[in-house]
Regions:
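Short, Lys/Arg-enriched N-terminal segments with co-localized hydrophobic residues
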Residues: 3, 8-17
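A glycine-rich phosphate-binding loop feature that marks nucleotide/adenosyl-phosphate handling sites
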Residues: 55-63, 189-193, 229-235, 269-279, ...
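Short glycine/threonine-rich loop-to-helix capping motif typified by GTGT followed
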Residues: 238-244, 279-291, 320-333, 361-371, ...
Length: 633
């Protein structure tokens, strides 16, 4: 039993182990060595290079093998039970995470009405955004009227300039209402480094604020007043190991600064909450959260806390905004569903699912309901809340956990050796590194090495934006409006440039027609027409596919009759030498002529004046921008 929090950890499942003398299943199969498995793969590759074909070189800095065996798991990795140090498998013996929903409304009365409504629909954690001008003695009673603070987690994102005032008002309100302060749960998300990173502000007094907050919340043992919002890095496009490595350095910055200022390490560690993002990389995100708990526990352990439970990471997870899209927005539900599932399997403490329409509007009641139900399905239909660390013991997940931990630890040490996280932020190093990662991913998207369904691949051909435009998000607190004193973190969604391209096409008032001149080999012309339709529709063009033409002349005549702005010749590589030049000459300057593919005769075609080719190796975004320019868009 923990002397500080009174928690007692026991395994909630009893296993009846098979007697060694009993017959084992599949005993007729002899063991297969790793070498034999690899030899079989090499044989099936029929001469292809094993490393190039089968080993995934991740952006996170390590390789992923095609198969894993017991010997791939580092010694001792995941050997503890859930709820045991270093908490790789979870900080508790169950997996009953909290379903959180954010509330950002202009008045206390509106926010209260929303909160009371969703609390009756399965939500058990609320997050209120509180602007500085709202921090008054009257605000909190109006905001929390009718809400039992002992039964729901209450989280507040408060203006940094008003956070201490707000905290005193909150504690006083809870006392006056007669709540058992030891049962009240929640957080007050004071994260000065995030403010410095996002707005370029200078908050040199933050250690004094932390001391004041820790003292103010001392009567609330289950409240956390310091936040590490590494979800901001995720939303800016950071790699998984970047987010984790920086998050650890971020938390350690607060831990070190506060303890040096005289705050006991237990008090500081138990007041830090990590708010991390969840990317769409399903298995790696499971591993990231497991690695996060383990590494943070070992960091806190170095400060020699009196209580082991100070080493537990309080971990909230938010689905990523980086990969959300304006077009085909319902696909956002699928993205956030798999993200929420990975966090649930990883055993985080609470989850926020971003509503599918958050990119372009204040979420509707329908979108909020779906976002909440996405978690409830995982809990009550998939029963993930009944299973603790189901990924534990998986050779793949355990190996990923170790690999991500190793790379994140390297980054953590590098930041510490150069003076700590805040120094790196003040010098713009963190912002630059994350910007580089985000740009790398945008380049991958432009080349379709990374896919956003409905944006750069398989767009909805008939969809129009309907006036939807990306929402501009800001702090909105009204404090510290001076110009940034340092570099700021650029948060841009992955698909923004494709969306801008498509919106520009719509705004031009003319929707270009792209005509597929399909001829020759049936299989190749169909494949290339499908590729070209998807390629050009991502810019919002109207695409006209065809079954096939008997001659170039017939195809060109049909294209002219359709008033095509673009004509795409779709055939086989061997036949382009025959069809391309006659088609190009017949079309002349009546339309833009494109060859679908990169045939061996490309140089001859270029010599004849053909300059537009689309294929899997081109930069889709730059090609479409160039076409828009030629079309006067």
């Amino acid at each position: 039993m923990c002397p500080c929090c009174g928690a007692e950890y026991k395994s909630i499942v009893k296993f009846n182990l098979m007697d060694k003398e009993k017959e084992r299943l599949f005993s007729e199969f002899s063991p297969v060595s790793t070498e034999n498995w690899k030899n079989k793969i090499v044989e099936d590759l029929k001469g292809a290079d094993y490393d190039k074909k089968m080993i995934w070189r991740t952006s996170e800095g390590f390789n992923v093998n095609p198969f894993y065996r017991k010997e791939d798991i580092p010694s001792g990795c995941g050997a503890e039970k859930p709820g045991e140090f270093p908490y790789t498998r979870g900080t508790k013996s169950d997996n009953n995470w909290l379903v959180r929903q954010d509330i950002d409304l202009p008045s206390a009365q509106e926010a209260n009405a929303r909160a009371r409504k969703i609390l009756g629909e399965g939500v058990d954690s609320l997050a209120f955004k509180v602007k500085g001008k709202l921090v008054t003695p009257e605000y909190i009673p109006a905001l929390l009227e009718g809400i039992d603070a002992e039964k729901v987690e209450l989280n507040f994102n408060v203006c940094v300039g008003k956070v201490v005032d707000f905290t005193h008002l909150l504690v006083e309100y809870l006392r006056q209402c007669g709540f058992n302060l030891e049962k009240v749960r929640g957080s007050i998300g004071y994260d000065p480094i995030a403010k410095e990173m996002l707005a370029g502000k200078n908050l040199d007094n933050y250690t004094e604020v932390i001391k004041a907050l820790v003292e103010a919340t001392s009567a609330l043992p289950q409240y956390r007043c310091i936040a590490v919002n590494s979800c901001k890095l995720n939303n800016a496009g950071a790699y998984i190991t970047q987010e984790l490595g920086y998050a650890l350095a971020w938390g350690n910055e607060y831990l070190n600064a506060a303890t040096e200022a005289g705050v006991p390490v237990d008090a500081v560690a138990k007041n830090i909450k990590f708010n991390m993002g969840i990317s769409s990389n399903f298995f790696m995100e499971i591993a990231k959260f497991r690695a996060a708990r383990m590494l943070w526990a070992k960091i806190v352990e170095q400060y020699s806390p009196e209580c082991k439970c100070a080493c537990k990471m309080a971990l909230h997870a938010e689905t990523s905004e980086f990969n959300l899209t304006l077009f085909d927005a319902y696909v956002n539900m699928l993205r956030t569903q798999t993200e929420a599932m990975s966090a649930a399997i990883a055993g985080v403490d609470s989850i926020t699912v971003t509503p599918y329409d958050a990119v372009y509007e204040a979420p509707t009641d329908f979108a909020l309901r779906i976002a909440k139900n996405q978690q409830l399905i995982l809990k009550h239909e998939s029963h993930l809340g009944k299973v603790t660390d189901p990924a534990g013991g998986s050779y793949y997940i355990e190996s990923l956990t170790a690999s991500i931990a190793a790379e994140a630890w390297k980054l953590f040490l590098a930041v510490e050796e150069e003076g700590g996280f805040r120094k790196a932020v003040k010098e713009g190093k963190v912002q630059a590194a994350v910007e580089e990662a985000g740009n790398s991913r945008r380049t991958a998207l432009a080349r379709r090495k990374e896919i956003l369904l409905g944006t750069n691949q398989y767009p909805n051909f008939s969809e129009l934006s309907g006036g939807k435009r990306p929402l501009e998000k800001g702090c909105g607190c009204g404090c510290n409006n001076e110009a940034p004193a340092a570099a700021t973190l650029s948060i841009r969604r992955l698909g923004e440039e494709f969306e801008q391209l498509r919106i520009a096409t719509e705004a031009s008032g003319k929707r270009p027609k792209a005509f597929m001149l399909t001829i020759g080999n049936l299989a190749m012309r169909q494949a290339r027409a499908q590729f070209s339709c998807n390629f050009l529709a991502t810019a919002g063009y109207e695409v006209i596919d065809n079954l096939g033409f008997k001659s170039v002349e017939e195809g060109v005549a049909a294209a002219m009759e359709a008033k095509a702005d673009i004509v795409v010749l779709c055939s086989s590589d061997d036949e382009y030498a025959e069809y391309a030049v006659p088609a190009f000459k017949a079309i002349g300057d009546k339309a833009i002529f494109i060859v679908a593919g990169a045939p061996a005769c490309s140089e001859e075609l270029k010599a004849a004046g053909i300059e537009n080719f689309i294929h899997v190796r081109v930069n889709v975004l730059e090609t479409l921008k160039a076409l828009n320019a030629k079309l006067g868009i």
